[in-house]
């Protein structure tokens, strides 16, 4: 199998590996071996460009498998951000990765969620309540139930849980909202601009470092 891996200088290098060696290298790259375990949750999240976090508890287990001795409080008390990244799905990421991930994925995720909002007939309502959403989350972090209550108190009583499921990623794709590891949300400043080509190159390099060796098609 022709593969690519991150070279010492950060660029890809090619080669051929048998299946057993390929599995060993991928486990090591994902910090799933004792020798390559991460020192803390931030290092673990950086190593794999974020862990899936649709389920908050499952995300904690994914981090625990990479950080020896990790407990739930370590995750909840960390600086990790819960947001929508690849494929429009929720991941826990290190804050330092937010600017370049947003540069690569923000526009496409915004288009995805724009479409979903329009299909549900929620787009115009969402635009009118966006300012209140950011203001409410700027006061203090809230879970979805708390957010619904606060928005209802500000004159948006018709917003349901299903609408929030689209509203939150839509706001996050604009850089205005970020999630906490415990499942709550807070207001956020849009991340600093990053050159799109540089951000894309960073994604390729980091993907190979965290999931390689990989075939060129895996980066498509």
Explain the meaning of each model-derived region.
Residues 158-220:
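Loop-centered beta-sheet repeat module
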């Amino acid at each position: 199998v022709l593969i690519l891996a991150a070279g010492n200088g950060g660029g890809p290098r090619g080669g051929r590996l048998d299946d057993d060696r390929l599995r060993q290298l991928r486990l090591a790259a994902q910090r799933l071996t004792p020798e390559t375990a991460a020192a803390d949750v931030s290092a673990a999240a950086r190593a794999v460009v974020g862990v899936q976090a649709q389920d908050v508890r499952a995300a904690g287990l994914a981090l625990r498998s990479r950080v020896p001795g990790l407990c739930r409080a370590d995750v909840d008390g960390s600086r990790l951000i819960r947001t929508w990244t690849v494929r429009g799905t929720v991941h826990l990421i290190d804050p330092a990765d937010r600017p370049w991930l947003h540069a690569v994925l923000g526009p496409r995720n915004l288009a995805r969620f724009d479409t979903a909002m329009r299909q549900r007939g929620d787009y115009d309502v969402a635009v009118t309540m966006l300012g209140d959403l950011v203001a409410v989350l700027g006061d203090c972090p809230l879970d979805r139930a708390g957010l619904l209550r606060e928005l209802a108190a500000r004159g948006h009583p018709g917003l349901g849980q299903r609408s929030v499921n689209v509203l939150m990623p839509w706001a996050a794709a604009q850089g205005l909202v970020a999630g906490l590891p415990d499942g709550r949300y807070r207001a956020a400043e849009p991340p600093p601009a990053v050159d799109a080509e540089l951000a894309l190159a960073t994604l390729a390099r980091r993907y190979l470092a965290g999931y390689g060796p990989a075939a060129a098609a895996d980066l498509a």
